[in-house]
């Protein structure tokens, strides 16, 4: 009887722990993460203080923090080829990373690290040198900077059948040396790495290539890492937020459902379907049942995004910054509709899949520069600084914990809906104007459309909408308007 009771208690503790790993530990009503892809730590610290904190962003996903192989031309993907767990990359060193985490936490912006637990680097002729000066022999699976030897890896094999679980989880993803997460030594080094980041004050982790690791092995690792550091403002016994990269199009042998109890999961179907809709391949009217009605994961288990650093580089339905009008409409819908744990992308310009981040002649990443309106100008795209996007982060904060109501559509590509009595969104993706009275659900008053302008010193620099005592307002979105979306909320009342 005692053994049974003890087993039940252990199961309850494990279940409680995994549920806690779905909590992003946001400040107040903040609820949007931004991925500052390839930014330097010092620049992220400054961005937290000058822009992200004041604009109400909840957190930052940062690029991998540990030492990586140096590849010719310095493509972005070299960051995903580790050779040690030393915290030295082109983004900065450990001291700069720790300073960034502290400064961002101080202004209510949490840090989530993109971590590489699945693999080390790919093949390299001879001795490879890393960003911290460590040497490795990838062809021999020798990484003295950890240290790892060939005994710590799965046998070399290629993934040729994505419906073969063994290949997916024990062969080499695009030639990257595949770690054996069932090994006690490998587990100990991964846990040590994650614990060090927790000690420095991070709030959680984006787990790269999670589907290529057995869920049982990840469960062991997650349950073995430390609670968050209370010296950085986290409560006692708080568990790291975990969101896992699991690409599952609905017909995968290794499915997202194997991982969603361990932490949140990247909902790639969201990205694909929202791109289809706003590219005009699917009528917006069907978005009324968006979320679980489309076969997506439960809201609290889904990390949602319009694009990410990988799929924005692929041809297909996924939207990116190169289709700005549709991208801004999709992002507005993403942040207005009550589904998922939202992340927005902040990119650098690219012409091909391998383009390096903006860098100088010595191949050092350069800092973003801004024009007089705050937009980036020197190779950084900085979608998070587009007014239409950061304004919707504010919208999402203003309407947090409200329900969707009063859905309207024209049977095609014009839609609107309310978020409680705090927010209203309208979208026009037709080739003709949207001009009509619509229920906004807002209290009577005059509201600034935060898409076309900003509320500054009591005046709106863009469109304004007068809402009557019954909640109705006249909404106009021309087919040739710069933006095909209009957004009102209670914090933008004139």
From Swiss-Prot:
The protein, known as: Alpha-amylase-related protein
Q: Biological process (GO) annotations? A: carbohydrate metabolic process
Pfam families reported for this sequence: Alpha-amylase, Alpha-amylase_C
EC code(s) of this entry: 3.2.1.1
Q: Where is this site: Transition state stabilizer?
A: 310
Necessary cofactors: Ca(2+); chloride
Key word Protein biosynthesis present in the record?
no
**What is any one of the record's Gene Ontology cellular component terms?**
extracellular region
List S-S links within the chain: 48-104, 157-171, 376-382, 418-441, 448-460
| UniProt organism field | Drosophila atripex
- The residues that the entry says bind chloride are 206, 308, 343
State the active site.
208, 245
Instruction: Give residues annotated as binding Ca(2+).
Output: 118, 169, 178, 212
- Class in the EC hierarchy, top level: hydrolase
| Keyword check for Hydrolase | yes
Q: Which reaction does it catalyse?
A: Endohydrolysis of (1->4)-alpha-D-glucosidic linkages in polysaccharides containing three or more (1->4)-alpha-linked D-glucose units
Family annotation (PANTHER family):
ALPHA-AMYLASE (PTHR43447)
Where in the cell is the protein located? Secreted
Residues with Pyrrolidone carboxylic acid modification: 21
Q: Which domain of life is it from?
A: Eukaryota
Protein keywords: Calcium, Carbohydrate metabolism, Chloride, Disulfide bond, Glycosidase, Hydrolase, Metal-binding, Pyrrolidone carboxylic acid, Secreted, Signal
Organism phylogeny:
Eukaryota, Metazoa, Ecdysozoa, Arthropoda, Hexapoda
């Amino acid at each position: 009887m005692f053994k049974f009771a003890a087993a039940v208690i252990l199961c309850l503790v494990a279940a409680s722990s995994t549920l806690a790993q779905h909590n992003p530990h946001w400040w107040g009503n903040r609820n949007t993460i931004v991925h500052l892809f390839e930014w330097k730590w010092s620049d992220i610290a400054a961005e937290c203080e000058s822009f992200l904190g004041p604009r109400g962003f909840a957190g930052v996903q940062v690029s991998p923090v540990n030492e990586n192989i140096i590849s010719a031309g310095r493509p972005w993907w070299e960051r995903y080829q580790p050779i040690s767990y030393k915290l030295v990359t082109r983004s900065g060193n450990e001291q700069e990373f720790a300073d960034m985490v502290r400064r961002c936490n101080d202004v209510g912006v949490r840090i989530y690290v993109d971590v590489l637990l699945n693999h080390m680097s790919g093949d390299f002729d001879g001795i490879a040198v890393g960003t911290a000066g460590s040497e490795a022999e990838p062809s021999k699976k020798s990484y003295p900077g950890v240290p790892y030897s060939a005994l710590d890896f799965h046998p070399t094999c290629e993934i040729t059948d994505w419906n073969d679980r063994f290949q997916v989880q024990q062969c080499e993803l695009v030639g990257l040396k595949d770690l054996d997460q069932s090994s006690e030594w490998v587990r100990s080094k991964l846990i040590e790495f994650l614990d060090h980041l927790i000690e420095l004050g991070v709030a959680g982790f984006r787990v790269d290539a999670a589907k290529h690791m057995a869920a049982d092995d990840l469960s062991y690792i997650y349950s073995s890492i430390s609670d968050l550091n209370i010296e950085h403002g986290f409560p006692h016994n708080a568990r790291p937020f975990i969101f896992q990269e699991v690409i599952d199009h609905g017909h995968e042998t290794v499915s997202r459902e194997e991982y969603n109890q361990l932490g949140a999961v990247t909902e790639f179907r969201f990205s694909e379907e929202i791109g289809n809709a706003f590219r005009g391949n699917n009528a917006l009217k069907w978005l009324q049942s968006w979320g679980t009605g489309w076969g997506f994961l439960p809201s609290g288990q889904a990390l949602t995004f319009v694009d990410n650093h990988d799929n924005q580089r692929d041809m297909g339905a996924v939207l990116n910054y190169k289709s700005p009008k549709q991208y801004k409409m999709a992002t507005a819908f993403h942040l207005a509709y009550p589904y998922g744990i939202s992340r927005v992308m902040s990119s650098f310009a690219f012409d091909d899949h391998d383009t390096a981040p903006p860098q100088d002649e010595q191949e050092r990443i350069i800092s973003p520069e801004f024009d007089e309106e705050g937009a980036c100008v020197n190779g950084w795209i900085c979608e998070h600084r587009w007014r239409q996007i950061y304004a919707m982060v504010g919208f999402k904060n203003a309407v947090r914990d409200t329900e969707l109501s009063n859905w309207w559509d024209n049977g095609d590509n014009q839609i609107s809906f309310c978020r409680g009595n705090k927010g209203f969104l309208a979208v026009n993706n037709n080739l003709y104007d949207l001009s009509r009275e619509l229920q906004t659900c807002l209290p009577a008053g005059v509201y600034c459309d935060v898409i076309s302008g900003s509320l500054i010193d009591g005046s709106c620099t863009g469109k304004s909408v007068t809402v009557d005592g019954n909640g109705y307002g006249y909404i106009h979105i021309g087919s040739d308007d710069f933006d095909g979306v209009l957004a009102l909320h209670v914090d933008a009342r004139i």
